[in-house]
Each structure stands twice: as C-alpha cells, then as structure tokens.
Amino acid sequence: MAPQTSNLWILLLLVVVMMMSQGCCQHWSYGLSPGGKRDLDSLSDTLGNIIERFPHVDSPCSVLGCVEEPHVPRMYRMKGFIGSERDIGHRMYKK
C-alpha cells in the first residue's frame, strides 16, 4: 500500500473509533433515567414552568425594570453604535 492510502485507512479507523466512543456514552440530562427512558410527565411540567416564569416577554423593558422608551431613539443609538466602525474606514489587519 502507498503511504497516502495507509494514512487514509488510519484516519478512517480513528474517525470510526471516535464515533463509536461518542455513540456508546450515556448522556445525562434533566429527566433522563439511567435506563434511557424519559419521564414525560416531568418534561411537560418543566415546559409549563418555563412559560409561567416569563409572562412579560412582549415587553422586555418591563422584565428588566427599565423605563419604556420610543423605538426611534433606540434605533438611532443602535445605528450609531453599529455604524461607527464603518465611518472610520477600513480596518488594517496585521499579518
């Protein structure tokens, strides 16, 4: 066999071994039993808790406690922040 072909076989074997080691692991997450079976009742309870926890998602300022402000000044501030890099010109990158 040519050296290039043997390197490809070694690489393929290494990839297969790594895939097998990842596939055989038990990945633990919330509500996953050691047997690999999920408890569906607890999953639905957690989704309900997540939805109840954030009731004011429509207005993010009320959740954070900041004062409501019109959208136009906020847009201009964001545009100025994002556009400030563009006004300077092209950046010079060192090689």
UniProtKB/Swiss-Prot annotation:
InterPro entries: GnRH (IPR002012), Gonadoliberin (IPR019792). Keywords: Amidation, Cleavage on pair of basic residues, Hormone, Pyrrolidone carboxylic acid, Secreted, Signal. GO terms for molecular function: hormone activity. The keyword Signal applies. The modification Pyrrolidone carboxylic acid is found at Q26. One of its GO terms (cellular component) is extracellular space. Stimulates the secretion of gonadotropins. This is Progonadoliberin-1. The gene is gnrh1.
